[in-house]
């Protein structure tokens, strides 16, 4: 576990420089006071980062993993936010229901999708993490699922300044669950993996086409360090 923590901390340090580019973009193009949706919150790293540069009118965190959620809850409570925030131990998709999350021991790779154990990329990752048995890499945990539309309607939310999605290959399903309330969403900021480690059953072109059809345009693209992944920001042309 120490070695896995060391790997994660090293990646977090490297990602800091990537995140500076993201923050710079939003400081230039967004309001100082924001309503923020963090889908795939993990331990609250993104909330902590944005809280240093923006004032939250309110924020909503979604973390499907009950294990990750306990750490998220502790970390957010320690930040002592005075404005409204909502911590949701639930997965998001295109419908309401139940499912499973594959909880990895390197917790940031946890995903609702299945892993492709024939993937050379995954085999290399397991080797780096010194995991020799696939079954020791993850365990299945039952979770509840809802959609963004369902949540937004229940909470009577009328504006989202930034919707961030980082759900390890489940991003497209979450975007499909925003078929009504995309109209109130200014920016969608998400990560897309081009490796074959996870069985996504969609391509980046599917996300791009869907967002274009909803009236969004791509305004930012940046490759993440040491990974076959990119971060994208799309802006609603009608807000």
Q: Can you name each region flagged by the protein language model?
A:
Residues 1-239:
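Phosphate/nucleotide-binding beta-alpha loop and adjacent structural elements of enzyme active sites
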């Amino acid at each position: 576990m120490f070695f896995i923590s060391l790997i994660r901390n090293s990646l977090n340090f490297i990602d800091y420089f990537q995140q500076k580019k993201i923050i710079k973009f939003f400081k230039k193009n967004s309001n100082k006071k924001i309503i923020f949706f963090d889908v795939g919150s993990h331990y609250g790293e993104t909330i902590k980062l944005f809280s240093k540069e923006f004032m939250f009118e309110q924020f909503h965190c979604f973390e499907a993993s009950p294990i990750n959620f306990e750490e998220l809850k502790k970390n957010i409570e320690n930040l002592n936010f005075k404005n409204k925030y909502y911590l949701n131990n639930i997965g998001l998709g295109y419908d309401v229901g139940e499912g499973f999350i594959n909880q990895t021991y390197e917790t940031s790779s946890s995903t609702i999708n299945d892993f492709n154990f024939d993937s050379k990329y995954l085999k290399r990752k397991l080797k780096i993490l010194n995991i020799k048995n696939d079954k020791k890499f993850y365990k299945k945990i039952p979770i509840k699922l809802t959609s963004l539309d369902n949540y937004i309607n229940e909470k009577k939310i009328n504006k989202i300044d930034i919707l961030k999605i980082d759900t390890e290959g489940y991003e497209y399903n979450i975007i499909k669950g925003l078929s009504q309330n995309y109209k109130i969403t200014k920016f969608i900021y998400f990560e897309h993996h081009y490796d074959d480690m996870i069985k996504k059953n969609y391509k980046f072109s599917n996300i791009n086409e869907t967002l274009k059809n909803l009236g969004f345009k791509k305004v930012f693209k940046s490759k993440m360090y040491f990974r076959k992944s990119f971060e994208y920001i799309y802006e609603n042309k009608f807000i």
